[in-house]
A protein has these predicted regions:
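Transmembrane alpha-helices of multi-pass inner-membrane enzymes
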Residues: 440-448, 456-485
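TM-adjacent membrane-interface loops and short helices in multi-pass inner/ER membrane proteins
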Residues: 309-390, 405-409
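Transmembrane signal-anchor hairpin modules in multi-pass inner-membrane enzymes, especially those
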Residues: 1-100, 195-208, 254-263, 476-485
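A membrane-periplasm/extracellular boundary helix in multi-pass inner-membrane enzymes
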Residues: 225, 249-349
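Transmembrane alpha-helical segments and their membrane-water interfaces
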Residues: 72-81, 99-157, 182-198, 249, ...
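Hydrophobic transmembrane alpha-helices and their immediate junctions
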Residues: 403-445
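Alpha-helical transmembrane segments of multi-pass inner-membrane proteins
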Residues: 139-167, 176-251, 274-276, 280
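Interfacial transmembrane-helix termini
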Residues: 45-67, 81-90, 99-123, 135-140, ...
Length: 485
């Protein structure tokens, strides 16, 4: 984007970060890489660090720590002179328009979770700009991927050794909620699928790639025992996207063998490893005899019930929460309001079966729809029929409720562009950036699917949201498309 505003912002990044370049160049590349990997690992477990190390439970502390980590990542990613980059005009307008709407809403309605517009307008674009100027961006992405892989493997070891599986229940790994576990898993699945895509694209032999298949099988196993339906849909969407893209590429270059081989190997290894993994989670914690149980642990049963249910926790909120009463769904109901919002609410009425299948989400959607306005609300949560609901279980609806309807329209444009641009990125840069080319569309498509029934948007509260916002760094850069094959 060639506007004066974007040039001004990029010039600001150049002035602030250029003095660090000679200092960072004195540090060995291996050390810089390890620092980046450590920062991403810290960001992945940021919530745990704030809560159990700093003994805090606050959006403020998470945000401060997250911004600090982004600053460190930006500095240690410097390797040459910073220059202006061409940013995609449509995406830039939608992105910064969304940020402006968020900030305006924060100004008129003070929020418990404020400042998202500033973070997305100034903090993350600074890292985007540095990465776009780096001569080895593939290594930067490798540091992120390695951080997630290391964290996942550590989590798997702890889970197999100390987190027991209860018969008739849903497995949550090291988390207290299997749905939260599942949302992290779809991000991990996208990362390993990008490795599989690289293996297929480059014709890598199985003896050199078998660990990728084993770890993908482990992710699919965890998804299965967590029974997290949203995560299952996201994983299916990512897998279907990969198959479609590889089929389209096969029609272009007439290379089908590696794609079919990769898919069949994944299916075979998953089937073979599943009973082994299942036996591990059932018996190893009992053999060790030192199970790790948290005070917040809730046993979610396969039939939808839960023992000692305490609700999903997103932010620590102590003030009064806005309340709304929604009548129980009836089989038939006349709705006389003729507005678009009224007709939408009416279409949700009378659908008791769908409401049960979606675990009451229809009632939640109706409650949030009735509270929409142009300025937004102080909170994310809402009390529906006397019961506290953590969030809207839909990102578009949550943005409309928290930041106002105009902000939701900008976010809608952003999500559409993210899917289109990420697929374009893969199609034109799969060879140049083979090690992470599929990660970008995998993250974007998985996130859009997941946020149809869940709420993920604060980058330093939940890692899937961070990964989605962070993926825009490559989508912003127009010069990649110009230099593509």
């Amino acid at each position: 984007m060639e506007s004066d505003e974007m040039n001004w912002l990029q010039d600001l990044f150049i002035r602030l970060l250029s003095p660090w370049i000679p200092i960072v160049r004195k540090i060995q590349p291996k050390v810089r890489y390890r620092v980046l990997t450590a920062c991403f690992m810290a960001d992945l477990v940021l919530f745990c660090i704030v809560r159990y190390v700093l003994m805090k439970e606050s959006y403020f502390y998470n945000t401060v720590c997250g911004i600090f980590l982004m600053l460190v990542i930006a500095i240690f990613s410097l390797d040459k002179k910073l220059e202006r980059r061409k940013w995609h005009k449509g995406l830039s307008v939608a992105w910064f328009g969304m940020c402006i709407m968020f900030t305006i809403s924060d100004f008129f309605v003070s929020k418990k979770a404020c400042g998202l517009g500033i973070i997305l307008a100034l903090v993350l674009p600074g890292v985007f700009f540095v990465w776009q100027n780096n001569s080895r961006k593939d290594l930067l992405w490798k540091s992120l991927k390695d951080a997630v892989k290391i964290s996942f493997l550590l989590m798997a070891v702890i889970s197999f050794l100390f987190r027991p599986f209860f018969e008739g229940g849903r497995y949550a790994g090291i988390f207290t909620n299997p749905n939260t576990f599942g949302l992290y898993l779809y991000v991990i699945f996208a990362i390993y699928m990008s490795d599989l895509d690289w293996n297929v694209e480059t014709g890598k032999k199985f003896r050199k790639a078998w660990t990728t298949y084993i770890q993908l099988a482990l992710v699919l196993f965890y998804i299965s025992v967590s029974q997290a339906r949203t995560a299952m849909l996201a994983v299916c969407g990512i897998l279907i996207l990969w198959v479609i893209l590889r089929i389209c590429l096969g029609k272009t270059n007439h290379k089908w063998k590696e794609t079919v081989k990769g898919f069949l190997l994944l299916a075979l290894i998953t089937v073979v490893c599943y009973p082994v993994f299942f036996a591990g989670v059932r018996h190893i914690p009992n053999l060790i005899g030192h199970p790790i149980l948290f005070e917040e642990d809730v046993l979610y049963l396969s039939n939808g019930e839960k023992i000692e249910g305490i609700g999903d926790k997103v932010l620590a909120e102590s003030d009064a929460i806005e309340s709304v009463q929604i009548p129980e769904p009836k089989e038939k109901k006349e709705f006389k309001e003729n507005s678009i919002l009224g007709r939408l609410i009416a279409s949700l009425d009378g659908n008791s079966t769908l409401n049960k299948i979606s675990n009451g989400r229809i009632t939640i959607y109706k409650a949030y729809l009735k509270k929409l306005n142009w300025k937004g609300h102080r909170r994310i949560t809402l009390t529906v029929n006397g019961k506290k609901v953590a969030h809207a279980h839909n990102n578009w609806l949550q943005f409309a409720y928290t930041y106002g309807v105009p902000a939701m329209f900008f976010y809608l444009i952003i999500t559409i562009l993210s899917v289109i641009r990420s697929i374009q990125f893969y199609w034109t840069n799969r060879r140049r950036n083979a090690t992470y080319a599929f990660l970008i569309p995998g993250i974007c498509v998985g996130f859009v699917i997941a946020t149809m029934t869940e709420c993920l948007f604060l980058p330093f509260e939940v890692f899937p949201a961070f990964m989605y916002w962070f993926a825009f760094g490559d989508l912003f850069d127009n010069s990649l498309a110009e230099a593509a094959e």
